[in-house]
A protein has these predicted regions:
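Domain-level signature for proteins that mediate thiol-based redox and metal-cofactor handling
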Residues: 1-184
Length: 184
């Protein structure tokens, strides 16, 4: 926290702490990468739902991508560290489970970077409920273009890729394996 000290005679007087504006808070959070997909930030991923001051305490509401996401604690720690770096020591990170996170909340520019990183971005669901990732028996045929060569000649290898929120695919044209960020 930034504290200004003014000299007024023989005693120093401390000015009240300077509270960062919310735009600075959002900018700091936009610099926090997702631990499992470091090419996009937690803001671009759409998991930071709200930021508000409650007196001198900053409250950050976060909706995890999955309620059991193993990166949740790491994300909370990274949030606190990023905000401490701009002088905010009193931070409450609140996990907000409702409404559930949707891949529709991923920013368009983040989808472009996912593809460049080698992860096929999820289809935009537009509010539809998709159960295709829940059970292989319910899985509808989903065309997942290869993020490397854009071929649609791809096949599902495993419902789970490098993380639970991704499936493993392989391109039949360039023969490269790749992750697909499952929509939900």
């Amino acid at each position: 926290m930034t504290v200004a000290v003014a000299q007024a005679g023989p005693r120093a007087v401390q000015a009240p702490p300077v509270i960062p504006v919310l735009a600075d808070v959002w900018a700091a959070l936009a610099g926090v990468p997702d631990p499992e997909i470091p090419v996009i930030s937690i803001v671009e991923l759409g998991i930071v739902r709200d930021v508000a001051w409650d007196g001198c305490r900053l409250v950050v509401k976060v909706t995890p991508t999955y309620s059991g996401c193993p990166a949740t604690e790491m994300i909370n720690t990274l949030i606190r560290e990023a905000l401490a770096a701009i002088g905010i020591a009193d931070v409450a990170v609140v996990n907000q489970l409702s409404p559930a996170w949707s891949t529709d909340w991923i920013a368009p520019e983040a989808r472009v970077r996912l593809k460049a990183y080698g992860i096929a971005p999820p289809h935009v669901m537009g509010g539809r409920i998709d159960v295709s990732g829940i059970s292989p028996l319910r899985r509808a045929h989903v065309v997942v273009p290869c993020p490397r060569c854009d071929s649609t000649n791809t096949q599902l290898l495993s419902q789970f890729g490098s993380t639970a929120c991704k499936a493993q695919y392989r391109c039949s044209d360039c023969l490269e394996p790749f992750d697909y960020f499952k929509p939900h």
